[in-house]
From Swiss-Prot:
Xenovulene A is a natural product exhibiting little structural resemblance with classical benzodiazepines yet is able to displace high-affinity ligand binding to the benzodiazepine site of the gamma-aminobutyrate A (GABAA) receptor and could be potentially used as an anti-depressant with reduced addictive properties. Pfam families: FAD_binding_3. This is FAD-dependent monooxygenase asL4. Pathway: Secondary metabolite biosynthesis; terpenoid biosynthesis. It comes from Sarocladium schorii. GO terms for biological process: terpenoid biosynthetic process.
């Protein structure tokens, strides 16, 4: 089959993952990133289940292992900092699902760097620009960028995250966006300078407070802590804060978390000084189809499952693998030197590939997103009353004493049932 000319809008995890596979197949790939350089900000992510297998098939397992954070586990603490329950990391070499701490705890920036390093010599990267508009012409897709350049492509892939502009343009004017925000559910992230103490372990510390509030700290290096603050936060300040208005978002989180206990006051002081603060309005993206014509979506642009499922990064990798595999299956390699003399045949093959992508991967995402909606997405296991917090802490303590895997078995949706990772021999050929 002839070489495909592919444009990927978004240079994050999903965009780099699909670029890796398509360039390995010999296709002509351009990746757009609206930031002026590779975006390596973001906090700790993890890989689970099928995502780890995809990483191994990429041949990047060793490179990623070199970046793994050696987190010992997770512990719940009370308002005085006393440990309520401890859940160690789980060795899954003998099977089973991982715990709250996975074997692959990695900073987002390190994941992006590993994928970019493996792809940059095969793909064309354009930083500081993105797609402004596109028109599907049938035999190609005409794309105009924000730098005013215009070109034609065989396929446009939107890998531009939960607020995807490609998704909105694909759905068309007047069609409501398919991002569903969970009612009043917010999470904020930032880092603080905090040299490690002599007896301190690399640990996730979780504090649940009345009012459905949560404070968590994690350590990824000896000099700093990651801080996570949020919960179910009704209130006009956060609801009305403009996305990206950091000052107003900080004030909203400060108002919400004030007086919770444990290290909240200390973290609010650090929040005011943080220059890497980010507020996420938790929600999900759910579509009936991830493509239209010569436009396809991948990653959070297509199926954001929210941080509540613990499957965001894994879903990005597995979805990109399935999309590339179906393109390989129906469109073949791009380095065979064949002329593109029949655009309608290319269109037909692409249509089959994109349909196959949905057929293969949608059952996976249906399980990951099962039961989530604007209302049910707010089931955060965080009680509103002090009595509820006390009961929850006792339940968590009993679960830990019984050595049950609370996160792996009941919270994180790693165990996707009756779904097998497809084999695509074309992707594994050198």
């Amino acid at each position: 089959m002839p070489q495909l000319k592919v444009l990927i809008n978004g240079g994050g995890i999903a965009g780099n993952a699909i670029a890796f596979w398509l360039t390995k197949l010999g296709h002509d790939v351009t990746v757009l990133e609206r930031f002026p350089a590779l975006r390596t900000t973001g906090l700790q992510l993890d890989l689970r289940g099928h995502g780890i297998e995809v990483l191994k098939r990429m041949g990047l397992d060793d490179a990623m292992k070199a970046k793994v954070i050696k987190e010992d586990g997770a512990q719940f603490v009370d308002t005085n900092g006393k440990v309520v329950a401890y859940f160690p990391a789980v060795d899954t070499s003998k099977g089973g699902v991982q715990a709250f701490t996975s074997e692959y705890e990695i900073m987002r920036g390190d994941i992006c760097r590993v994928f970019y390093a493996a792809t940059k010599d095969r793909a064309t990267y354009k930083f500081g620009t993105s797609v402004e508009s596109f028109e599907d012409l049938g035999d190609s897709i005409k794309v105009q960028l924000t730098d005013h350049t215009v070109d034609h492509y065989d396929l446009l892939i939107g890998a531009d995250g939960v607020t995807s502009s490609i998704r909105k343009m694909m759905l068309g004017p007047g069609v409501p966006d398919k991002f569903i925000q969970f009612q009043n559910l917010y999470a904020s992230y930032f880092t603080i300078p905090a040299p490690i103490k002599p007896d301190e372990k690399y640990m996730a510390n979780i504090f649940i407070a009345p009012g459905s509030k949560l404070l968590m700290t994690r350590r990824d290096n000896p000099e700093r802590l990651q801080v996570y603050m949020g919960g179910k936060a009704p209130g006009a300040r956060l609801e009305n804060a403009r996305r990206g208005d950091t000052a107003e978002e900080k004030l909203g989180i400060e108002e919400f978390m004030q007086g919770c206990g444990w290290r909240t006051s200390e973290m609010i002081d650090e929040l005011r000084k943080a220059d890497d603060f980010y507020l996420e309005r938790l929600g999900m993206v759910k579509l009936d189809s991830w493509h239209r014509g010569r436009v396809a979506l991948v990653g959070e642009a297509a199926w954001c499952s929210s941080v509540l499922t613990g499957m965001g990064t894994t879903s990005c990798l597995v979805g990109a693998y399935c999309l590339a595999g179906e393109i390989a299956k129906h469109c073949g390699r791009g380095d065979q030197g064949e002329a593109k003399d029949d655009p309608m045949m290319v269109q037909k093959n692409l249509a089959n590939a994109l349909a196959g992508y949905e057929e293969k991967f949608m059952p996976f995402m249906h399980q990951v997103q099962d039961g989530l909606s604007a209302k049910t997405g707010t089931r955060t296991y965080m009680p509103s009353s002090q009595w509820g917090v006390t009961i929850l802490n006792w339940v968590i303590k009993i679960i830990a004493l019984l050595r049950l895997n609370m996160a792996g078995d009941w919270v994180i949706r790693e165990a996707v049932r009756n779904w097998k990772l497809p084999d695509y021999p074309e992707l594994l050929k050198e």
